């Protein structure tokens, strides 16, 4: 989503691996490599430091070892993370796997993929329930003034008078534009410390700068709004 352009407000879609891509369904197959690049899902304890959860395996697709993934962002938007990554990291309870993806494509509102070494429907069905992660470095590059929601979480929010408003705890898509959920410390009715929340539209009229290096967002917003 563009921090300076309210016309880009519909681009972000989800809080995990969230994309800001154009809302066009991808029908073409994204090839993960040559068919000769073989291998099977491998148990692993090593886990990428930049792993981001982007979906979950919900079913098999067809008879030849393809899996169906419900994405945390609409296919063709957030689903692009799955299409772009050549390796997925899977987690189900205490079980962790690393798998190379041979092919992937969108299918309706899901992403379907062929993991290396998974050759039939039964093997694909055995993968149901795995949460799917990809490395943040595998996300497609964005245009200027576009941001992944996952990169906004945790950033400090201040107004133009340098008054601290809190930190981004999450994002909401209301169908028109994205909204930042900004948590800040407060005092409850019982006098005990608690947290409260501000909802700030993530559109150019309010969001003035997003400095990811400084982990700060400057907004035109007052503390008593």
UniProtKB/Swiss-Prot annotation:
Pfam families: PRC_RimM, RimM. Keywords: Chaperone, Cytoplasm, Ribosome biogenesis, rRNA processing. InterPro entries: PRC_barrel-like_sf, PRC_RimM, RimM, RimM_N, RimM_N_sf, Transl_B-barrel_sf. The PRC barrel domain binds ribosomal protein uS19. NCBIfam families: 16S_RimM (TIGR02273). An accessory protein needed during the final step in the assembly of 30S ribosomal subunit, possibly for assembly of the head region. Essential for efficient processing of 16S rRNA. May be needed both before and after RbfA during the maturation of 16S rRNA. It has affinity for free ribosomal 30S subunits but not for 70S ribosomes. This is Ribosome maturation factor RimM. It comes from Burkholderia cenocepacia (strain HI2424).
């Amino acid at each position: 989503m563009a921090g300076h352009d309210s016309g880009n407000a519909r681009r972000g879609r989800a809080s995990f691996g969230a994309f800001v891509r154009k809302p066009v369904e991808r029908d073409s197959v994204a090839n993960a490599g040559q068919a000769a690049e073989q291998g099977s899902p491998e148990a692993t304890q090593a886990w990428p430091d930049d792993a981001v959860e982007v979906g979950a395996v919900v079913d098999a697709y067809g008879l030849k070892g393809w899996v169906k993934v419900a994405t945390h962002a609409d296919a063709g938007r957030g689903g692009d993370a799955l299409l772009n990554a050549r390796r997925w990291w899977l987690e189900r309870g205490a079980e962790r796997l690393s798998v190379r993806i041979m092919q992937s494509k969108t299918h309706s509102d899901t992403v379907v993929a062929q993991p290396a070494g998974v050759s039939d429907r039964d093997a694909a069905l055995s993968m149901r329930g795995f949460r799917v992660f990809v490395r943040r470095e595998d996300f497609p590059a964005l245009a200027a003034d576009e941001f992944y929601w996952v990169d906004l979480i945790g950033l400090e929010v201040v107004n133009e008078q340098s008054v601290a408003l809190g930190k981004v705890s999450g994002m909401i898509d209301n169908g028109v534009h994205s909204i930042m959920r900004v948590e800040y410390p407060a005092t409850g009715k019982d006098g005990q410390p608690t947290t409260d929340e501000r909802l700030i539209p993530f559109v150019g009229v309010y969001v003035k700068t997003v400095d990811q290096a400084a982990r700060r967002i400057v907004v035109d917003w007052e503390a008593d709004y």
